[in-house]
């Protein structure tokens, strides 16, 4: 306050000397403008930080509505009380508000990344500072374009930061070109970022390489995907599989399996339900309360489907127990199961006997450490890229390159961690059988992570999966309503209305 008063006083004195002879051009010292910003390394780091908004924001990738949108279309969950029933039931249209917000959040981050990339080129900063700023900006832009391509298909590719309305009209690029832009950005990020980012919440070289390999998988460029991902299994990288439970709670975040996480904490303001960029926003996530039983402070928006449980329980481990990944992801009525610090049986006998036979999501929940999700705040990071994903993507690459032994080798690393028998002990050495185990292992490993529907689409299995679950009350309408146009979301109406060169993608015209 004292400093502000001094500035105002100095301005007043200056004005008294100048009088009316000259116009006085005063800038508000408390307002950030292009003229006062973009000066220091700190300014650029703040600008990059603003680009992460789409990943944490309520409407963004790992936010409340973004996560529910990504998981609601697969066969692995039953959307009991969906946040957006039209998306879950395949009746959404181009004016759907949830998809519009999700789409816009990516372009908001892209605009911020573009600003950083465009403006830093002529700055006289150290190479170290420039590299990490450019690396993060390219990573963020690549992340956005990868997800826009896999969720909306053909979209505009914007690479220039501009406030000029004349620059806004832009035609869509084909999905392959959008993926190519993601490849370009992740490749650039891998060249700029350090092997280990000093800030664990930020991407590293390995993060960029892992996503680059994943884009190649989506492009079905198996050779390049293998060549990209394989180095992550060797020195100088030190990734490895850890106890699966370490990937589901707050206690072991940033462990050796983690390649990229979206961070949450109890820091920040008090506003949990932040629909805009609010200085009072909490840095926590509201996801944990979405799936818990109401008696544990939850909303019971979704539960584990019986189709998914059949996959979880298809194999016993070497000790005759259910798969540890099932037990760490789901609570159900089995001996020793705990649910919000009570035995599962005790909790439901006391609170809701009728729902005792259901399967309850506990992955990324506070069930082990809290009695309730009542305040709706959680600090559990979302694990966006794990080493397990790299191994299973490599298994898929090897299989598509006709190297069955290589695929089985990667599968066995996943199976060993789960204490399952080696693949060859239980299954046939055929392309079909190996692929089926890849499908099953991905469903189990990445349950609740929002991978399932995209996996089913790229394998051409959406209709088959929906047909298998059509007798489930929560999936009957999905089966009835689904047509191929629902493989991707339509370009939102607002983009079509405001971008004169943007045309709706063919299935939605």
Task: Tell what function each PLM region has.
Residues 4, 8, 20-69, 115, ...:
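Acidic, glycine-rich segments characteristic of secretory precursors and extracytoplasmic regions
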Residues 40-49, 53-59, 81-152, 173-176, ...:
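Conserved, well-structured interaction surfaces
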Residues 42, 48, 57-59, 81-104, ...:
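Elongated scaffold/linker segments in the mid-to-C-terminal portions of large proteins
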């Amino acid at each position: 306050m004292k400093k502000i008063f001094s500035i105002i006083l100095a301005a007043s004195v200056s004005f008294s000397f100048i009088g009316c002879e000259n116009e006085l051009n005063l800038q508000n010292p408390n307002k950030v403008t292009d003229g006062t910003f973009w000066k220091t390394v700190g300014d650029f780091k703040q600008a990059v930080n603003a680009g992460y908004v789409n990943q944490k924001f309520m409407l963004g990738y790992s936010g409340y509505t973004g996560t529910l949108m990504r998981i609601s279309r697969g066969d692995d969950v039953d959307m009991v009380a969906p946040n957006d029933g039209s998306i879950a039931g395949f009746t959404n249209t181009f004016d759907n508000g949830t998809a519009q917000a999700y789409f816009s959040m990516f372009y908001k981050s892209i605009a911020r990344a573009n600003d950083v990339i465009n403006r830093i080129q002529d700055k006289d900063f150290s190479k170290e500072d420039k590299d990490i700023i450019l690396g993060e900006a390219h990573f963020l832009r690549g992340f956005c374009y990868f997800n826009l391509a896999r969720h909306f298909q053909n979209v505009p590719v914007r690479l220039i930061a501009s406030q000029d309305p004349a620059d806004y009209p832009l035609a869509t690029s084909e999905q392959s070109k959008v993926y190519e832009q993601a490849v370009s950005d992740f490749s650039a990020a891998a060249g700029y970022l350090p092997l280990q980012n000093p800030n664990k919440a930020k991407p590293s070289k390995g993060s960029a390489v892992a996503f680059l390999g994943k884009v190649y998988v989506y492009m079905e460029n198996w050779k390049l995907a293998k060549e990209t991902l394989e180095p992550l299994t060797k020195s100088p990288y030190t990734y490895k599989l850890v106890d699966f439970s370490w990937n589901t709670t707050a206690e072991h975040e940033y462990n050796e399996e983690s390649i990229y996480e979206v961070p949450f904490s109890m820091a920040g303001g008090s506003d949990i339900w932040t629909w805009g960029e609010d200085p009072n926003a909490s840095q926590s996530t509201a996801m944990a309360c979405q799936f818990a039983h109401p008696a544990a402070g939850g909303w019971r928006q979704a539960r584990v489907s019986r189709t998914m449980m059949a996959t979880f329980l298809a194999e016993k481990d070497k000790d005759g127990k259910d798969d540890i990944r099932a037990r760490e992801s789901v609570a159900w009525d089995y001996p020793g199961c705990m649910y919000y610090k009570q035995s599962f049986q005790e909790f439901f006998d006391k609170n809701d006997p009728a729902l005792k036979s259901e399967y309850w999501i506990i992955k990324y929940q506070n069930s082990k450490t809290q009695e309730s999700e009542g305040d709706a705040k959680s600090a559990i990071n979302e694990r966006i890229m794990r080493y397990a994903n790299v191994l299973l993507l490599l298994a898929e690459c090897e299989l598509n390159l006709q190297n069955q032994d290589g695929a089985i080798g990667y599968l066995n690393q996943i199976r060993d961690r789960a204490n399952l028998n080696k693949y060859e002990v239980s299954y046939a050495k055929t392309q079909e059988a190996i692929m089926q185990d890849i499908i099953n292992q991905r469903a189990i490993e990445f349950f609740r992570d929002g991978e399932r529907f995209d996996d089913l689409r790229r394998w051409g299995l959406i209709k088959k999966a929906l047909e298998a679950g059509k007798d489930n009350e929560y999936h009957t309408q999905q089966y009835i309503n689904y047509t191929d146009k629902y493989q991707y979301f339509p370009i939102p109406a607002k983009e079509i209305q405001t971008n004169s060169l943007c045309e709706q993608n063919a299935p939605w015209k």
